[in-house]
Design a protein with these regions (language model features):
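Thiamine diphosphate
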Residues: 1-33, 39, 44-65, 118-184
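Gly/Ser/Thr-rich loops at beta-strand to alpha-helix junctions
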Residues: 1-5, 51-53, 79-81, 140-147, ...
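Generic secondary-structure signature for well-ordered alpha-helical cores
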Residues: 10, 14-17, 39, 56-70, ...
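Short beta-strand segments
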Residues: 21-25, 47-48, 73-77, 140-141, ...
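Gly-rich Lys/Arg/Thr-decorated short loops/hinges at beta-loop-alpha junctions or inter-strand turns
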Residues: 21-23, 37-42, 102-110, 127-135
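Flexible glycine/proline-rich, aromatic-decorated loop/lid segments
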Residues: 28-38, 171-172
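Conformationally flexible catalytic loops at phosphate/diphosphate-handling active centers
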Residues: 69-128
Length: 184
């Protein structure tokens, strides 16, 4: 549970240096407890709870941990267990890298490509939703992104940590003058 993670706070810096993955369901899209762990050194991956997306980001977290020898936290909104897809075991057999890879944009983009190829998905570190011709954009994560994108463009985060500044800046249209960061 998200509250249970708070008991691990003192251990997370050490766990961040090990290839471990935590999967945490965030009921009712309440991310406050999970987001308190941003400064722990552990990578953080978010998925909205759509079963196929949740499966893909979970696999991304495992490959990230295996290739970089770093800990990862995959948190996702509540999903119905009956709707979860069944991933073949062969997809999850990712050997530990003999030498840890540097946690760089190149490594991360390679892992996203690997997962998309294996599962036939199109997951990304972030996604821009809604209209692009505006002077305001909101950056956020959560299930509400789809609803709000009808009013203002939304940059929906999926790779919360490490957050690529280059990727974030490149995703914002040049017409934008104001950026709102929405956190709940």
């Amino acid at each position: 549970s998200p509250q249970g993670l708070l008991r691990l706070v003192s251990h997370l810096p050490a766990l961040a240096k090990l290839p471990v993955v935590f999967h945490v369901e965030t009921p009712q899209a309440l991310h406050a407890h999970v987001l308190q762990l941003r400064h722990s050194g552990i990578s953080m991956v978010y998925s909205s709870g759509e079963p196929r997306e949740t499966e893909a980001y979970a696999l991304f977290a495992h490959i990230l941990a295996a290739k970089t020898h770093t800990g990862a936290l995959h948190f996702f909104d509540t999903v119905s267990a009956n709707n979860l897809p069944s991933t073949q075991a062969s997809l999850l057999q990712v050997p530990l890298a003999p030498e840890p890879s540097e946690l760089s944009d190149v490594t991360i983009n390679g892992i996203f490509s690997d997962v998309n190829e294996r599962l036939g998905t199109d997951i990304q570190p972030l996604r821009v939703l809604g209209a692009h011709a505006t002077d305001t954009v909101a950056v956020m994560l959560g299930a509400e992104t789809t609803k709000l994108s009808a009013y203002v463009p939304i940059v929906s985060l999926h790779l919360v940590r490490p957050l690529s500044a280059r990727c974030l800046v490149d995703s914002i249209p040049t017409s934008v003058k104001r950026v709102a960061v929405l956190e709940h």
